[in-house]
Curated annotation (Swiss-Prot), chain A:
Domain of life: Eukaryota
Transmembrane domains' residue ranges: 9-29, 47-67, 80-100, 114-134, 168-188, 216-236, 248-268, 280-300, 309-329, 335-355, 376-396, 401-421, 459-479
GO biological process: ATP synthesis coupled electron transport
UniProt keyword annotations, A-Z: Electron transport, Membrane, Mitochondrion, Mitochondrion inner membrane, NAD, Respiratory chain, Translocase, Transmembrane, Transmembrane helix, Transport, Ubiquinone
Family stated for the protein in its record: Belongs to the complex I subunit 2 family.
GO MF annotation, one: NADH dehydrogenase (ubiquinone) activity
GO cellular component term of the entry, any: mitochondrial inner membrane
Name assigned to this protein: NADH-ubiquinone oxidoreductase chain 2
UniProt keyword S-adenosyl-L-methionine present: no
Topology of this chain in the membrane: Multi-pass membrane protein
EC number assigned by the record: 7.1.1.2
Chain's role: Core subunit of the mitochondrial membrane respiratory chain NADH dehydrogenase (Complex I) that is believed to belong to the minimal assembly required for catalysis. Complex I functions in the transfer of electrons from NADH to the respiratory chain. The immediate electron acceptor for the enzyme is believed to be ubiquinone.
Curated annotation (Swiss-Prot), chain B:
One protein family per Pfam: Oxidored_q3
Keywords noted in UniProt: Electron transport, Membrane, Mitochondrion, NAD, Respiratory chain, Translocase, Transmembrane, Transmembrane helix, Transport, Ubiquinone
Keyword Transmembrane helix in record: yes
Protein name per Swiss-Prot or TrEMBL: NADH-ubiquinone oxidoreductase chain 6
This protein's GO CC annotations: mitochondrial membrane
Classification lineage: Eukaryota, Viridiplantae, Streptophyta, Embryophyta, Marchantiophyta
EC number: 7.1.1.2
MF annotations from Gene Ontology: NADH dehydrogenase (ubiquinone) activity
């Protein structure tokens, strides 16, 4: 028990310990009179980034255990969790790179938010490798608790406080629904472990009106609703635009990047591995169509950048759910490719949003004539927007192509059709960015401050990837194929 | 058996007093009495851990919270003179429905063990009485929580840590404008000079 489990969990243990040490460091030194109450944000930020990078290294080097059930079947590690964790840690690291400069400019001296980001990263690692309903619920709860706090972390802004409160109340509801679903499943089957659930559900047809227990059906329904709430799929998306708009921009970036990976990974584990059944497929089918349509239509009316990005992320969740509702290996693979590319594009967009600041980059119209004032940034943003829209050689096209292909492969023609139509519609508002940057002359010309070097590196890497992904996509395909096989076999 | 009746009668009486008491503070105190008696009943049932948790959670946290809320709200006692009978029909119906549901639930088998029908002739008796190895609730819980489920225990401790950090982050202001209580100065104040009568 001890030698294997602690060896395999070493990255998580390291991250928790580093976080707690950082917390103590911050508490002790930021209140010390001797050093004149130093603002430790940048310091703690760099140290936090360093510990995330070391954790990536620890995960990537890997323990000698490739596949194992850990801590009495509460966690699992295999190829799927391995790649998901590395990817999650990379995206967290990129968020932290963005936040280094942000806190200084906003003069927001809260090193606690970095500690909370680290803690939530840790919970997301647990969420990816959760193998038991209780472990899953606890990880989700830890993550959302951190999120409520960092959403409200800018206390002197009313928007941020509102976002935190709204997120807290709605998130508490969704957690309650999720927990209710878990307890229904436990009540009607008597097990909480995913593997045992998978054994029970093989060949067990869950029908609402049939002879079998409707309690299990309701349990799965509730769990699905809880999850859809967390990833902002459409009937349960109400909180997303307000929360995304209200929270500080760096927190918005974190919200729209990291939890998408972990929650989708956990959903795949729960629904594809444990409850493999056609009954939930209809639900995801419906949510996917609704999110694509709403993401395309509602984003057109927005003129604030963060709100628009929130709706665009809702639309992308719809596209990802296409892969989910297929339920085939190709579907899962295309979902994983899709989330990878989505995260890269989102990192890029938020780095630009954070880089453009005179006072604050809030409305889309503020972008006017960026092509004159900062041509390189304008080209970067327009490449990303074309990629979001799915214009052929770029990475965004590849992800959408494989998602629609998977939908066609399993006979869900309606999904593919609506996907194509909505992505054409959504081209309108993505390309509007380009139009404003290149062809509009603003009333007042604004000059933006130069961005810091970390962000420029991040932008360069992501743009390079987005542009040249089509030349050599096979590593990603191999990796995602292996991950999908890991879940299905 | 006498103890059981004592607890039941006290719980019921103080439960009624929660509703009847004019002073909200008194009714919260009666609520605490109800909780104490119920935990006594739980001990009699052999649920020692539940009794403990009941006291800790309900009396220690929730009832004290209620007391604070009641004291802060500053309700005048004279203002509360409503007709109790007004709420009787609705409350009575809800109570009756609740009672009916409980009678429906008692002695019901929720989960049939197997969907197929087994004939009873196959079954033989096992004398389970000889196999019982008796542990109390506390021992069982401790054994499970610190061995099999230690991971969950640690994760919940992290959740509590986050709650702690969150409460501090969201409420503590570090600027100089905030009025803060200095304990030493507060204790050193001369009570004679703080309040003066102005003629």
């Amino acid at each position: 028990m001890f030698e294997h489990d602690f060896l395999a969990l070493f990255p998580e243990i390291f991250l928790i310990n580093a976080t707690i040490i950082l917390l103590i460091y911050g508490v002790v030194f930021s209140t010390s009179k001797k050093y004149d109450y130093p603002p430790l944000v940048r310091n703690v930020g760099w140290l936090g980034l360093l510990s995330v990078l070391i954790t990536i290294l620890l995960v990537a080097v890997g323990s000698p255990l490739a596949v194992a059930n850990l801590v009495y079947n509460n966690l699992i590690i295999d190829n799927f969790t391995y790649f998901c964790q590395i990817f999650l840690l990379l995206s967290t690291a990129s968020t932290m790179v963005m936040c280094l400069d942000y806190f200084k400019q906003e003069s927001l001296n809260a090193f606690e938010s970095i500690v909370l980001i680290l803690l939530s990263t840790c919970s997301m690692l647990f969420m990816i490798s959760a193998y038991d309903l209780i472990a899953m619920y606890l990880a989700i709860e830890l993550q959302s608790l951190c999120f409520y706090v960092i959403a409200a972390s800018k206390r002197d802004s009313e928007f941020s406080t509102e976002a935190g409160l709204k997120y807290f109340i709605l998130g508490a509801f969704s957690s309650g629904i999720l927990l209710f679903g878990c307890s229904m499943i436990y009540g009607f089957t008597g097990v909480t472990n995913f593997e045992e659930l998978a054994k029970i559900f093989t060949g067990y047809e869950i029908t609402l009106f049939g002879a079998q227990s409707s309690g299990i059906f309701m349990g799965i329904l509730f769990i699905a609703v809880g999850f859809l709430f967390k990833i902002t799929a459409v009937p349960f998306h109400m909180w997303a635009p307000d929360v995304y708009e209200g929270s500080p921009t760096i927190v918005t970036a974190f919200f729209s990047i990291a939890p998408k990976i972990s929650i989708l990974a956990n959903m795949l584990r729960v629904f594809i591995y444990s409850f493999y059944d056609p009954t939930w497929q209809q639900l995801f089918f419906f949510c996917s169509i609704a999110s694509m349509i709403l993401g395309a239509l509602a984003a057109m009316a927005q003129n604030k950048v963060k709100r628009l990005l929130a709706y665009s992320s809702i639309g992308h969740v719809g596209y990802l759910l296409i892969g989910f509702s297929c339920g085939t290996i190709e579907g899962i693979q295309s979902l994983l490719i899709g989330i990878f590319i989505y995260v890269l594009m989102t990192v890029n967009v938020f780095a630009i949003v954070l880089a453009l600041r005179q006072n604050r980059f809030k409305y889309i119209a503020d972008l006017g004539a960026l092509a004159k004032t900062n041509p390189i940034l304008a080209i970067t943003l327009s490449i990303t927007m074309f990629s979001y829209a799915g214009i052929p050689p770029l990475a965004g096209f590849c992800s959408k192509f494989y998602l629609f292909f998977a939908a066609l492969g399993c006979g869900a023609y309606l999904l593919a059709l609506i996907g194509v139509v909505t992505s054409v519609i959504s081209c309108f508002y993505y390309i509007r960015f380009v139009k404003i940057m290149y062809f509009d002359t603003p009333k007042t010309w604004v000059l933006y401050k130069p961005m810091d070097r970390e962000k420029s590196l991040l932008l360069a890497i992501t743009v390079f990837f987005i542009t040249f992904f089509f030349l050599y996509p096979s590593p990603l395909f191999l990796v995602t194929h292996q991950m999908a096989l890991c879940l299905c076999l | 058996m006498i103890l059981f009746y004592v607890f039941v009668v006290l719980a019921l009486v103080s439960g009624a007093m929660v509703i009847r008491a004019k002073n909200p503070v008194h009714s919260v105190l009666f609520l605490i009495l109800v909780f104490c008696n119920t935990s006594g009943l739980l001990v009699l049932l052999g649920l020692d851990f539940f009794a403990m948790i009941f006291l800790v959670v309900y009396v220690g946290a929730i009832a004290v919270l209620f007391l604070f809320v009641v004291m802060m709200l500053h309700i005048r006692i004279e203002e509360i003179h409503e007709n109790v009978l007004r709420y009787l029909p609705v409350g009575g119906i809800i109570g009756l429905i609740f009672l009916l549901e409980i009678f429906l639930m008692v002695d019901n088998d929720y989960i049939p063990i197997l969907p197929t029908k087994l004939s009873a002739t196959y079954l033989t008796y096992t004398v389970y009485a000889g196999k019982i190895h008796s542990w109390t609730n506390l021992e069982t819980l401790g054994n499970l929580l610190y061995t099999t489920y230690f991971f969950l225990f640690l994760v919940s401790s992290l959740i509590l840590l986050v709650a702690l950090i969150g409460a501090i982050v969201l409420t503590m202001h570090k600027t100089t404008k905030v009025k803060r209580q200095d304990v030493f100065i507060q204790n050193a104040i001369d009570f004679q000079n703080t309040i003066k009568k102005v003629r």
